[in-house]
Amino acid sequence: MEDEIWAVVHRHLKSIFERDSATYVATTSEDLSLYEWWVTPHRQDGLDFHRFMIEHSWAGSGDYRYDLLEPRLQLYGDTAVVSYTFMLSRAKPEGGVSHRTHNESRVLIKRDGQWQIVHVHKSPAWQAPFGNEP
């Protein structure tokens, strides 16, 4: 079951970077709640926010890879919590590679035999108290 949950998480994440809104919608609950710390300090609800961003290629384009550092899965029946440090690596058009990291938690539930993401929380991956971003 853990492999099944991680497969959904990876399909979900790839859909964001590959502008695949159909897969994003299939792997995400309509009543999604999320915190994107770099966008706004307030909760956002529903799919419209990310669907708009996906359709307008907010994640950029070009060659990328992501890694989930220190992944953890906690399973409670039909509810799962995954947490990790998300590291995104992108090829720069002028050459070289850039990296960004942040921490994520995602909550999934199993409805009608399918796992869907119902909550996302992202936070900075630098040490508190907040000063200048490293």
Indicate where each model-derived feature is located:
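Hydrophobic/aromatic beta-strand elements that line small-molecule binding cavities or substrate pockets
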Residues: 12, 50-54, 68-73, 86-88, ...
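Short beta-strand edge/turn micro-motifs at domain boundaries
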Residues: 101-131
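Residue-level signal for tight coil/turn positions that link beta-strands
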Residues: 70, 77-79, 112
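Short, cysteine-centered beta-strand-loop-beta hairpins and adjacent loop/turn segments enriched
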Residues: 89-98
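A solvent-exposed, acidic/Ser-Thr-rich amphipathic alpha-helical stretch
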Residues: 2-3, 21-75
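Short beta-strand segments enriched in hydrophobic/aromatic residues
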Residues: 28, 86-88, 121-124
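Hydrophobic pocket/interface hotspot
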Residues: 12, 24-25, 32, 49-50, ...
